Amino acid sequence: MSRKAYLILENGTVFEGKSFGAEKETMGELVFTTAMTGYLETLTDPSYFGQVVIQTFPLIGNYGVIPSDFESKVPSLRGYIVREWCQAPSNFRCEGDLDTFLKESDIPGIYGLDTRALTRIVREYGVLNCKIAYSGEVTEEELAEIKAYKIEQAVESTTISEKEEFKAENGDLNVVLMDFGAKHNIGCLLYTSPSPRDSTSSR
């Protein structure tokens, strides 16, 4: 049976759901995506570094985990919020389920809460800081800590450590990309370079 989990917003609002993925408390900026497909791309998109992401589409995980769909090698987000996750994924490329992937990536998730009501709050008030916790009781000190959260060292945490080459089947252009947290879906012969670099080091 899944453990109860709570999403605490910086304005004091608390949503109750159930835990999946890694069981750990975490804080982040609360954002949402309305994408109906591509949850693996969302999970591995470096632009979500430091954020807790809400999926508004009600069922997530139905085609499992497919590494070739990843936008980066590992997830950069801090937490993952869904209405329901599929416990029996089906796809000929599937290599695992969402719960196991989140556990292995040390990403906590919550399911079973009203993601659309939560999204309306974000739309009305803008980006809010939040905390994934396992107690619904909130102290003033805890709220102050949530409000003070800031995303730091995003580039340093998402850039690569050494140069890489990505080959495109039909690419006839060569591009050097300075990696400040780049995504993998680019249709050229691509060389990535760690950040920061001067112009001569990319040659």
Task: Report residues per predicted region.
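Single conserved hydrophobic/aromatic residue that forms the stacking wall/gate
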Residues: 191-203
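RNA-binding accessory domains that recognize and position tRNA/RNA substrates
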Residues: 2-174, 178-188
